[in-house]
C-alpha cells in the first residue's frame, strides 16, 4: 500500500515536471524552435486546427522558422494565424513555404520573460508540493485506520519528502536552463 502511494506520488510529480517543461518551451527565446508555433490554431473548414496538422515546421537557421503548408489553399490562413498570434511574429510566404523570422529580444523583454519563467516554475513547485501533501494525507489515513505503525508513517513521509526534494531540484534545473537560454541569445 505504501509503495503504491509513493509510486503514485512520483508519477504525478513527473507529470507536473513534464507540464512545466511544456509551458516553458512555448516561451520564445531568440532561437528559432519549431515548438514555438505548436499552440497556433488555423481556421480550417470552419474549425480551429493545430498548425502541426496542416504544415511541417522546421528551424531553417538560428533566427528563422520555415513552415511548409501541405495544402496550398491554406497558405494565407496559416500566415494570418501566425500574424495574429500573440508571439509578435511577421511571416512572409514564398511558394508553399512561409518563412517566419524571429526578431531579436530586447534586454527588457528578456527580463519580462524570465519573470514569466519563474512564475511558471513556482506553479510547478506548488503542484509538486500538493502531490506531496496528498500522499502524506493518504499515509496519515492509513495510520488512522491502524493499517500501518507510526514508524512506518514517519519512514514513508521521509521517503515522500526525498522524492519531493528531487523533483523540486529538477524544476530548479529546468528554470536555470531556460534563464540561461534567454540571457545567452
Swiss-Prot record:
One of its GO terms (biological process) is cytoplasmic translational termination. Keywords: Cytoplasm, Protein biosynthesis. The keyword Cytoplasm applies. Coiled coil: none annotated. Pfam families: RRF. InterPro entries: Ribosome_recyc_fac, Ribosome_recyc_fac_dom, RRF_sf. It is found in: Cytoplasm. GO terms for molecular function: ribosomal large subunit binding. One of its GO terms (cellular component) is cytosol. Belongs to the RRF family. NCBIfam families: frr (TIGR00496). Responsible for the release of ribosomes from messenger RNA at the termination of protein biosynthesis. May increase the efficiency of translation by recycling ribosomes from one round of translation to another. This is Ribosome-recycling factor. It comes from Haemophilus influenzae (strain 86-028NP).
